[in-house]
From Swiss-Prot:
Compartment(s) of residence: Membrane
A Gene Ontology BP annotation from the UniProt entry: sensory perception of chemical stimulus
A GO CC term assigned to this protein in UniProt: membrane
Keyword tags: Membrane, Transmembrane, Transmembrane helix
Name used for this protein in its record: Serpentine receptor class epsilon-27
Name of the encoding gene: sre-27
PANTHER family hit by this protein: SERPENTINE RECEPTOR, CLASS E (EPSILON)-RELATED
Membrane-crossing segments per the record: 31-51, 64-84, 125-145, 167-187, 195-215, 257-277, 290-310
Length: 364
């Protein structure tokens, strides 16, 4: 939605927030919010479990862990922004006499389709929520580029990368790309970016990270083939062999995350494009929004299933209905089998007493 400030003295005439409000009955909003909160709670559990497994079951170099861990943890920033927006939708937060529970398109040049206000007073939390969502999206997109560069560095420094931390690499990449993410978030928030610019930024970033991933993977696969060749001419150290295998595993994980991310962005972009062309009803935006907010269902699951050790612990963290029914069935079997066991024990006890009674009589 775009907020237009009618105050002529302001230096910020427009704000562009990546959020949606809906012109719905309050009861419908409450029902939808309740369903969303249940789903977000499940996502919260998924994120916590995935982050715990990723950190505890260490399968990669520390530098890779430092860069990838935020992919899971930064979801909390996104969901806080959504909860703030939800409070405005449910009228928990209000702006004086201004009614904002109305659907506004994501981007438009038509002032009639904007939220027109005399000042931004009372909208501070909504603005913060919009910034959080922008920052999340740019952080994830640029984070993928950072991971690709880190794996490129691991391949270039293959001789001693595994034996040393070189922690300055993930720190420098994180600081650099966070500066870019915050800058882009501010530019988008203050309506300095167009919708084409934002989409172009995401597409170019994803394309660059994908290209780097594929190139580095191809190089490492070639090295692996040389190492396994029986007539190889070059001697590879154990550290180099281990680093190549780790690079391949990390690149495979990175590709899966990028494809999951691209799939999420594609779904959101497709629905928003149809909305801008007024081909679908505004209520469909709920699907587009939650494709973003519920992304841990896809991204975390894809990541956890990429490594067998992670997959096992991840599956154990979610007891299925089948397991529950099997446990219930086993409990019933145990209860039913107790009766013959008790009768058998009683019979043995009686037979033992009779035996000792007869033995005692024979002695006397």
């Amino acid at each position: 939605m775009i907020i237009k400030n009618m105050d002529a003295s302001t230096n910020v005439p427009y704000l562009w927030l990546p959020i949606f409000l809906y012109d719905e009955p309050i009861l419908a909003s409450q029902v939808i919010a309740s369903i969303e909160l249940i789903l977000y709670s499940i996502c919260l559990y998924i994120v916590v479990v995935s982050l715990k497994i990723f950190v505890q079951v260490r399968m990669f170099h520390l530098n890779f862990i430092i860069l990838v861990a935020p992919f899971f943890g930064i979801w909390f920033e996104l969901i806080i922004g959504k909860l703030i927006t939800m409070c405005y939708q449910l009228s928990i937060f209000s702006i004086g006499n201004l009614e904002i529970r109305k659907f506004y398109v994501l981007w438009t040049d038509d002032s009639n389709k904007m939220l027109v206000v005399n000042s931004f007073e009372g909208l501070e939390l909504l603005i913060i929520a919009g910034f959080m969502e922008y920052h999340y999206m740019f952080s994830v997109v640029f984070g993928a580029v950072a991971v690709a560069i880190e794996r490129l560095a691991a391949s270039v420094l293959i001789d001693n990368y595994e034996s040393t931390n070189k922690i300055f690499i993930p720190i420098a990449l994180t600081v650099f790309f966070q500066i870019i993410a915050i800058t882009c978030s501010c530019l988008a928030l203050f309506h300095k970016f167009t919708i084409i610019t934002i989409n172009g930024t995401w597409i170019v970033s994803c394309a660059c990270s994908s290209i780097v991933f594929f190139l580095v993977e191809r190089i490492n696969l070639r090295w692996k083939a040389e190492m396994e060749h029986p007539r190889r001419e070059k001697v590879y150290t154990i550290s180099q062999r281990f680093q190549v295998k780790e690079n391949i595993r990390a690149l495979d994980l990175g590709k899966r995350l990028i494809f999951s991310e691209l799939g999420t962005i594609s779904i959101i972009g497709l629905i928003i494009a149809t909305l801008l062309l007024e081909l679908v009803p505004p209520s469909l935006v709920h699907i587009a929004e939650n494709a973003l907010f519920l992304n841990p269902f896809g991204i975390c699951t894809v990541a956890m299933y990429s490594i067998p050790a992670w997959k096992k612990r991840y599956k154990n963290a979610f007891p299925s209905i089948f397991c529950f029914l099997m446990r219930l069935k086993n409990r019933k079997i145990d209860v039913q089998s107790m009766e013959p066991l008790e009768e058998f024990s009683k019979r043995i006890y009686e037979e033992t007493n009779i035996h000792f009674a007869q033995l005692n009589e024979s002695w006397t």
